[in-house]
A protein has these predicted regions:
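Acidic, low-complexity, intrinsically disordered peripheral segments
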Residues: 7, 397-435
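Small/polar (Gly/Ser/Thr/Ala-rich) solvent-exposed segments
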Residues: 38, 61-83, 87-88, 98-127, ...
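Transmembrane beta-barrel architecture of outer-membrane proteins
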Residues: 90-92, 138, 183, 271, ...
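Periplasmic alpha-helical coiled-coil/stalk elements that build and connect Gram-negative outer-membrane
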Residues: 128-242, 253, 342-345, 349, ...
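A short glycine-centered flexible hinge/capping loop motif at secondary-structure junctions
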Residues: 171-175, 374-378, 415
Length: 435
């Protein structure tokens, strides 16, 4: 089958497996192997075949008939010869050509309908591509985020180990207390639990990455901030209305419904055909010898009554047009809601990150002061451990917010049908649309 080649037509290609894996490479790998994309591509092929069937209505149909067998005739011809029950070796050969000349533009409307169906199906494939690429990006970012949380948790555990060692030394030398040792061991156990939990989450993230991408992650790198983000909410909504493939598919669905109605209007017109034919028959209907004909006929057929079926079909077509219009309105409302929520998320995360960064910076400064005060006996090791725990939580919160912001940016681009383009896959996407 040619679908792997089709999908590869709008990808840059898979990079060597021995190198690190960029986000673009992960997306490429996902798009090449995802079965939902393959299924959508087959749907495009099916719609294209329907379009070709519609175009065939412009072309003539040619039929060849060959028939041979025994004939026993008792008619006026055989009775005139005195042989009322004569047997013949009947042989028929005919070829006919039928060319539509006029059908009330039904064929033209049917072709436009199938072209609209093909365009809608292609846009649904584009939707599948955008959504699948977005899931790939989400899995990619999650692996990075969880790995960073593991690193922070391990640093925090190391600090607990160092602090516990110092407190045990102070206790053994008679300076510290047993309570300090017990408290530090408890906090160290909690820190170890955090490491184990973060490692489990990181492993689960790798499992999810494999499910989405089709291979295990390898040396992932933090992607840069995407380009092409809208500057205002109004701009984001308009971009989504103009470029979102779901909206385009709904618009083409409406066009297909309108063309279906125009096709039905052709039923109220006569149909005119050119019929050409030639026959070469032998020993037919009791007449011995050759019986040859050549015909060239223009035929007109005009239905006068079909039990009200045409009127009912027209009502159905109008109802489908109205339904498609309402579906498009509902989709635009949904897109407006999605874009607005994503825009609010972006603004909220941007503000939160500023405060989270301030929290991290302030906690780092506080830790430096605590260490200075520890040196002169104004702070205990447990005090330092407390501020180190707070710094771990602050850094973890900042990491999560930064990755949430990046994912929200990707989602906003995908809602506007621009995510693949922001990844540098614009030419490949255009090749799909022109297909």
């Amino acid at each position: 089958m040619r679908h792997p080649t089709l999908i590869a037509a709008f990808l840059f290609g898979i990079s060597s497996l021995c190198s690190g894996q960029t986000l673009v490479e992960a997306i490429e790998q996902t798009l090449l192997t995802n079965p939902n994309i393959q299924s959508s591509a087959y749907n495009v092929d099916a719609a294209d075949a329907l379009r070709r069937q519609a175009v065939a209505g412009y072309l003539p149909s040619i039929d060849l008939v060959l028939a041979r067998g025994l004939e026993k005739s008792d008619n006026t011809t055989t009775r005139a010869t005195g042989d009322a029950n004569r047997n013949f070796d009947r042989f028929e050969r005919s070829i006919t050509l039928n060319q539509m000349l006029y059908d009330g533009f039904s064929t033209a409307a049917f072709v436009k309908q199938q072209e609209a169906v093909l365009s809608a199906t292609t846009q649904r494939l584009a939707t599948t591509l955008e959504n699948t690429a977005l899931r790939s990006a989400q899995a990619y970012l999650e692996v990075l985020r969880r790995d960073q949380v593991v690193a922070l948790a391990q640093v925090n555990l190391t600090q607990h180990d160092e602090t516990l060692l110092k407190i045990e030394e102070r206790f053994e030398s008679g300076v510290g207390t047993k309570v300090d040792v017990v408290q530090t061991k408890g906090r160290r156990a909690q820190s170890k639990s955090s490491v184990l939990l973060s490692e489990k989450d990181a492993q689960n993230g790798r499992v999810e990455f494999y499910r989405v991408v089709g291979e295990s992650p390898r040396e992932l790198s933090l992607p840069v901030r995407p380009k092409g983000l809208p500057e205002t909410l109004e701009q984001a909504v308009q971009l989504a209305f103009r470029n979102n493939p779901q909206v385009k598919a709904a618009q083409f669905d409406l066009e297909a419904s309108q063309s279906a109605r125009k096709q039905l209007l052709g039923g109220y017109h006569p149909r005119v055909d050119l019929a050409l034919g030639a026959t070469r028959n032998d020993d037919m209907d009791g007449s011995p010898g050759a019986n040859d004909d050549e015909t060239a006929v223009i035929k007109m057929s005009y239905n006068l009554y079909r039990g009200g079926a045409d009127r009912a079909k027209m009502k159905e077509a109008i109802a489908r047009i109205n339904g498609a219009e309402q579906a498009l309105i509902a989709l635009r409302r949904s897109i407006t809601q999605d874009v607005s929520i994503l825009w609010n998320d972006l603004e909220d995360l941007s503000i939160r990150i500023e405060y989270l960064q301030l929290h991290v910076t302030s906690t780092e400064e506080a830790l430096a002061v605590y260490l200075e005060q520890l040196a002169i006996g104004r702070r205990t090791l447990l005090d330092v451990l407390d501020i180190q725990n707070e710094l771990f939580r602050a850094r973890s919160g900042l990491v999560s917010a930064e990755f949430q912001l990046r994912l929200a940016e990707y989602r906003l681009l995908a809602t506007g049908g621009q995510f693949l383009g922001s990844m540098g896959l614009t030419n490949q996407r255009a090749a799909l649309t022109r297909r």
